[in-house]
């Protein structure tokens, strides 16, 4: 009877995962229709729905298991046998690696994230050596120009599954050929071999053709974002062929792609050649398997800890009033813990901070908000924690700590990609770097605002600079929707002495924001003020923000480009 119960539990979990991934593929498969219909609000809703599917199905399985087991508590040996039986179901299972993560999620939900040990759940994969030796159908098709690059591109683009007409396909092909010839020599292109993914990658208002360009043994990305005009006709907006550009397109600050992937591991391996700087966790996350991305992030952390002797330290930069942030000196992630008590000027609650981080997870991040992974009961060996950090943890988050003697448990934290704090970057920047940083910062604010996100606290310390020089927002405790804010002009003073008073001469409600005030706390430095006024002076005008609000209320969804505007074919034509 017991063995049958263990078998039933294992099969119930795997069937639950099958149901979840089936719904995942179903929502993903609708991406083409939503794109063709230009139903951008449905695109946003589908993105949120797909994110929620995972936790929903974990909850369904947990309820089934409680019914099956009559909510009995089982010993360690029983749980180990369930995992062993589940492992035995996976050798021929096509999505075994994500099925392992689903098992982990069910276990954590049942046992409140306690006793997270390798004998009870898949801290490490049961099949680390397994690769997809046989794939039911190829992920990509091969194309060789044979001296006729334009003809080959015509064949590739006409063969797409999209059912809309092209605005001017021959024009776009000419642009693509021009971009390729500018990037590579004739000698390189003589051996050109293209591999084009069968499935389009959908995100925001674009459908991305993703491919590889093989030249004399070297491999380059070949990325074409397809948009449509106001008449519903298709056009290609640019052609990207560098690994740095591809890395930004698949960046950690962007929403997940909608791409139909029955075999996600195979797609991850295929993408790895054009995204060599991306970790396994980042690749899974980029294609929408963010929960397995979380598993892989933890495994990458464990691998780093195993091969390193570094101690955890307080992260460089200005200490936050809401979050305690720490890192390892050469690790590319940071760890963020919500403080038990906030600074007096912070009028937020712990619950509100959690809501803000969830909002960011579900919202279109437009390349300007860092994705996070959330962990509970995170265990760290005490000898790996610097004395300064340990004292800080004990002072700022004692309610979230559990001391196990040689280890500490942090009850809740976020893991996030590490960046250089913008304020520190600006302190070391030369004039051109400073100008570029201010341009990027202003663009980040504007793109977030256009996506209905107001950062709240706009100080430079709340933004980071990526290795590609992009500015990304990462402090979410005051974030809110643009439509919730009342942007006001400062009323003129009634009397000359009003301007000298310590208190404002006008009433201020909780949601009131006065953009004129941004100038005072952002532009105390003369050079910063000059660059800001030159490139982003409109951010100091309440009318600019109210205009954006009106566009949002009118239902307008802004275009989001994962590349510079000057790279757009339409801009090249103007130049």
Curated annotation (Swiss-Prot):
- One annotated GO molecular function: ATP binding
Summarize where ATP binds, as residue positions. 315-321, 336
Q: Which GO terms describe its cellular component?
A: cytoplasm
The gene for this chain is aceK
What's in the keyword line of the UniProt record?
Answer: ATP-binding, Cytoplasm, Glyoxylate bypass, Hydrolase, Kinase, Nucleotide-binding, Protein phosphatase, Serine/threonine-protein kinase, Transferase, Tricarboxylic acid cycle
EC number from the UniProt entry: 2.7.11.5, 3.1.3.-
What role does this protein play? Answer: Bifunctional enzyme which can phosphorylate or dephosphorylate isocitrate dehydrogenase (IDH) on a specific serine residue. This is a regulatory mechanism which enables bacteria to bypass the Krebs cycle via the glyoxylate shunt in response to the source of carbon. When bacteria are grown on glucose, IDH is fully active and unphosphorylated, but when grown on acetate or ethanol, the activity of IDH declines drastically concomitant with its phosphorylation.
Q: Where in the cell is it found?
A: Cytoplasm
The biological process GO terms on file are: glucose metabolic process; glyoxylate cycle; tricarboxylic acid cycle
* Record InterPro entries: AceK_kinase, AceK_regulatory, Isocitrate_DH_AceK
Note one Pfam family from the annotation: AceK_kinase
The similarity comment for this entry is: Belongs to the AceK family.
Active-site residue numbers? 371
Kindly provide the name given to this protein in its UniProt entry.
Answer: Isocitrate dehydrogenase kinase/phosphatase
**Catalytic activity as recorded in UniProt:** L-seryl-[isocitrate dehydrogenase] + ATP = O-phospho-L-seryl-[isocitrate dehydrogenase] + ADP + H(+)
């Amino acid at each position: 009877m017991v063995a049958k119960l263990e078998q039933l539990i294992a099969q119930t979990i795997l069937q639950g995962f099958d149901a979840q991934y089936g719904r995942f593929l179903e929502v993903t498969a609708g991406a083409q229709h939503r794109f063709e219909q230009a139903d951008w609000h449905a695109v946003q809703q589908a993105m949120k729905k797909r994110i929620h599917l995972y936790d929903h199905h974990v909850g369904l399985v947990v309820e089934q298991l409680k019914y099956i087991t009559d909510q009995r508590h089982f010993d360690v040996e029983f749980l180990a046998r369930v995992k062993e039986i589940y492992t035995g179901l996976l050798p021929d299972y096509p999505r075994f690696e994500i099925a392992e993560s689903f098992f982990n999620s069910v276990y954590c939900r049942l046992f409140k994230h306690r006793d997270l040990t390798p004998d009870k759940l898949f801290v490490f994969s049961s099949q680390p050596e397994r690769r997809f030796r046989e794939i039911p159908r190829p992920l990509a098709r091969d194309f060789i120009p044979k001296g006729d690059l334009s003809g080959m591109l015509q064949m590739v683009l006409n063969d797409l599954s999209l059912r809309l007409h092209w605005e001017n396909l021959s024009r776009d092909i000419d642009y693509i050929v021009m971009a390729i010839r500018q990037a590579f020599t004739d000698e390189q292109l003589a051996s050109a071999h293209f591999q084009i993914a069968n499935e389009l990658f959908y995100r925001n208002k674009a459908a991305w053709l993703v491919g590889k360009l093989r030249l004399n043994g070297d491999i380059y990305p070949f990325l074409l974002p397809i948009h449509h005009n106001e008449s519903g006709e298709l056009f290609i907006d640019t052609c990207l062929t560098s690994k740095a550009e591809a890395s930004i397109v698949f960046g950690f600050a962007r929403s997940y792609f909608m791409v139909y992937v029955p075999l996600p591991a195979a797609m991850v391996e295929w993408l790895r050649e054009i995204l060599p700087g991306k970790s396994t966790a980042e690749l899974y996350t980029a294609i929408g398997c963010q929960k397995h991305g979380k598993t892989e992030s933890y495994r990458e952390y464990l691998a780093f800890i195993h091969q390193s002797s570094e101690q955890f330290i307080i992260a460089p930069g200005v200490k936050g009033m809401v979050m305690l942030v720490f890192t390892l000196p050469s690790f590319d992630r940071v760890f963020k813990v919500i403080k038990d008590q906030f600074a007096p000027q912070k009028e937020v609650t712990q619950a509100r901070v959690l809501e803000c981080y969830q909002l960011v997870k579900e919202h279109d991040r437009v390349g300007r908000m860092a994705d996070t992974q959330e962990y509970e009961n995170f265990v760290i060996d005490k000898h790996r924690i610097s004395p300064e950090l340990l004292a800080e943890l004990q002072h700022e988050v004692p309610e979230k700590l559990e001391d196990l003697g040689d280890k500490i448990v942090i009850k809740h934290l976020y893991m996030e990609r590490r960046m250089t704090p913008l304020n520190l970057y600006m302190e070391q920047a030369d004039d051109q770097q400073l100008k570029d940083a201010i341009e990027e910062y202003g663009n980040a604010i504007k793109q977030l605002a256009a996506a209905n996100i107001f950062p709240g606290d706009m100080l430079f310390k709340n933004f980071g600079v990526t290795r590609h020089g992009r500015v990304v927002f990462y402090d979410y405790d005051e974030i809110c929707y643009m439509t919730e804010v009342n942007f006001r002009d400062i009323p003129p003073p009634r009397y000359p002495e009003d301007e000298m008073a310590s208190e404002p001469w006008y009433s201020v409600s909780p949601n009131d924001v006065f953009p004129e005030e941004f100038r005072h706390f952002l532009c105390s430095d003369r050079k910063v003020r000059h660059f800001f006024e030159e490139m982003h002076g409109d951010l100091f005008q309440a009318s600019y923000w109210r205009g954006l609000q009106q566009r949002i209320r009118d239902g307008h969804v802004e275009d989001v480009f994962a590349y510079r505007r000057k790279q757009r074919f339409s801009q090249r034509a103007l130049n």
